[in-house]
């Protein structure tokens, strides 16, 4: 019944647009013929958008979204019907979302069930992490792949170390290279990677490359054509030709994945571009974190890429050599688990796992993120943890790359500070790491920010680490970052100027749309 009503309102919306357009044409070109005098064209246009905004509001109301999102959209549509109309067409449509991702979700579920291992790892995990039992069981129920204890992980700090490792890995490739990125730049670093991929393709290595069509919209056609001409399969993720008529613009692939010969992998916060090496004048030093994997868990990263590849191309890569990662010998590596999140998931997978991590904390919760727009669940969990005496620290950049998100993020500071959360702003450059560390023996590193876009709209991928050496490196890096940061104190922050508070509150009101 509810879907039928949505469809009726959607048809009425199209009908209103058609009738109003016809009225506009009649008044603009045939007013003398039909005998209409002193008719305001702008008035008719205003009626058009007002009626359309009203119908859109009805659709949003019936979708039963989160109350804050529903209220925000209704306010925007009510006060600014013209702006709200176009904003909804660009960013708000939820009508086709379920149908859009139904096929992908089914394929993902089938593939995960086919390749998910059956190793009985539960006893080993709970022996050393009994208080995190909720997290393990939740990850399993949400469809995360098995934890691997035969995978080497290494934390890569910043662009120089990360891209040196990636470039060397690409040069070692013998069978295949799979890459998936949100942003690819046609600059010095991008050219260096392109040249290696072309050379590897000439050597007979299979190269597949997914790039997000919106994140990489500045990428030149010549860059893509040169790779394709050399035999590299470079495919855009969700290309958008008519943004206003296509709600795919709102669902972006924010993942950063590299898989080499099915046995080495990289995942983390760094895109491909010189700015991520600290060569942008505005940002200066770029602080970011990536993760290197070798061994069993790379199969999970491979599977995530292959599902995205199939969704975009229809090519099912099923050859066994793509999913036979070699386990690294030894029992001292700790555990690693790859988790994919996205609008195609039934559950908000990464958000739920973040929540479980926070809830499992006994001593400390350390978070580094460039964007902080939490929903009520995450916000409450952090405040409750801090009020309970847990050491909760939030590290963010001191300069904005997106002013709307920057100021919306700061609007949450007062209540966090009042609860006892320690907040720091990184001053050496721009902080882009996406890190959560709990009790120094559990961590998440990946592409997901601590914001609603990563939780609800973007395709993301995170690695969850359990008692690995790479966590100890993350802890030390976090401590080093605090040395380059300034702490925000509540008594001082509460005294900020009125106009700054107004800006922050305004952007927070719009945060469900950001």
From Swiss-Prot:
Residues at the active site: 254, 256, 261, 432, 434, 439
Alphabetical keyword list: Cell membrane, Lipid biosynthesis, Lipid metabolism, Membrane, Phospholipid biosynthesis, Phospholipid metabolism, Repeat, Transferase, Transmembrane, Transmembrane helix
Transmembrane segments: 7-27, 41-61, 71-91
Ranges where the PLD phosphodiesterase domain occurs: 249-276, 427-454
EC number: 2.7.8.-
Family annotation (InterPro entries): Cardiolipin_synth_Firmi, Cardiolipin_synthase, CLS_N, PLD-like_dom, PLipase_D/transphosphatidylase
One GO cellular component, as annotated: plasma membrane
Membrane topology: Multi-pass membrane protein
One function term, GO molecular function aspect: cardiolipin synthase activity
Subcellular location(s) of the protein: Cell membrane
Highest taxon, organism lineage: Bacteria
GO biological process, one term: cardiolipin biosynthetic process
Annotated catalysed reactions: 2 a 1,2-diacyl-sn-glycero-3-phospho-(1'-sn-glycerol) = a cardiolipin + glycerol
Entry's family note: Belongs to the phospholipase D family. Cardiolipin synthase subfamily.
Annotated function: Catalyzes the reversible phosphatidyl group transfer from one phosphatidylglycerol molecule to another to form cardiolipin (CL) (diphosphatidylglycerol) and glycerol.
HAMAP family to which the protein is assigned, alphabetical: Cardiolipin_synth_Cls (MF_01916)
Record-given protein name: Cardiolipin synthase 2
């Amino acid at each position: 019944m509810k879907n039928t009503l949505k469809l009726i309102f959607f048809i009425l919306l199209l009908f209103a647009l058609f009738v109003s357009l016809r009225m506009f044409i009649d008044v603009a070109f045939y007013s003398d013929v039909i005998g209409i005098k002193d008719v305001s064209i702008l008035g008719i246009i205003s009626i058009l958008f007002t009626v359309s905004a009203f119908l859109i509001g009805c659709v949003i109301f019936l979708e039963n979204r989160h109350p804050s999102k529903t209220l925000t959209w209704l306010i925007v549509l009510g006060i600014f019907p013209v702006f709200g109309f176009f904003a909804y067409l660009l960013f708000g449509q939820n009508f086709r979302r379920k149908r859009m991702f139904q096929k992908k979700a089914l394929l993902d579920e089938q593939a995960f069930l086919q390749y998910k291992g059956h190793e009985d790892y539960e006893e080993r995990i709970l022996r050393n992490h009994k208080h995190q039992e909720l997290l393990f069981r939740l990850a399993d129920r949400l469809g995360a792949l098995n934890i691997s204890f035969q995978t080497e992980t290494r934390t890569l700090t910043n662009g120089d170390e990360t891209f040196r490792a990636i470039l060397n890995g690409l040069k070692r490739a013998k069978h295949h290279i799979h890459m998936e990125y949100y942003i690819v730049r046609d600059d010095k670093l991008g050219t260096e990677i392109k040249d290696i991929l072309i050379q590897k393709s000439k050597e007979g290595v299979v190269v597949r490359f997914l790039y997000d069509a919106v994140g990489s919209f500045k990428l030149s056609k010549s860059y893509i054509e040169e790779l394709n001409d050399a035999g590299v399969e470079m495919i855009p993720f969700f290309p958008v030709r008519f943004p206003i008529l296509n709600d795919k613009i709102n669902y972006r692939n924010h993942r950063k994945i590299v898989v080499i010969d099915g046995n080495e992998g990289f995942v983390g916060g760094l895109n491909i571009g010189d700015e991520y090496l600290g060569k942008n004048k505005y940002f200066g030093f770029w602080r970011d974190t990536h993760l290197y994997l070798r061994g069993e868990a790379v199969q999970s990263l491979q599977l995530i890429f292959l599902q995205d590849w199939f969704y975009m191309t229809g090519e099912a890569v099923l050859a066994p050599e793509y999913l036979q990662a070699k386990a690294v010998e030894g029992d001292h590596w700790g555990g690693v688990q790859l988790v994919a999140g996205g609008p195609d998931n039934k559950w908000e997978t990464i958000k739920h796992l973040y929540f479980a991590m926070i809830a499992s904390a006994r001593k400390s919760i350390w978070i580094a993120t460039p964007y902080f727009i939490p929903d009520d669940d995450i916000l409450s969990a952090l405040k409750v943890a801090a009020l309970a005496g847990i050491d909760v620290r939030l590290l963010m950049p001191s300069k904005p790359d997106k002013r709307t998100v920057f100021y919306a993020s700061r609007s949450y500071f007062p209540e966090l500070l009042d609860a006892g959360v320690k907040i720091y702003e990184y001053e050496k450059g721009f902080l882009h790491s996406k890190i959560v560390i709990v009790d120094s023996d559990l961590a998440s590193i990946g592409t997901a920010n601590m914001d609603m876009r990563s939780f609800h709209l973007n395709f993301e991928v995170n690695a969850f680490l359990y008692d690995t050496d790479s966590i100890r490196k993350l802890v030390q890096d976090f401590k080093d970052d605090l040395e380059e940061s300034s702490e925000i104190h509540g008594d001082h922050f509460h005294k900020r100027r009125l106009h700054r508070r107004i800006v922050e509150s305004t952007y927070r009101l719009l945060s469900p749309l950001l």
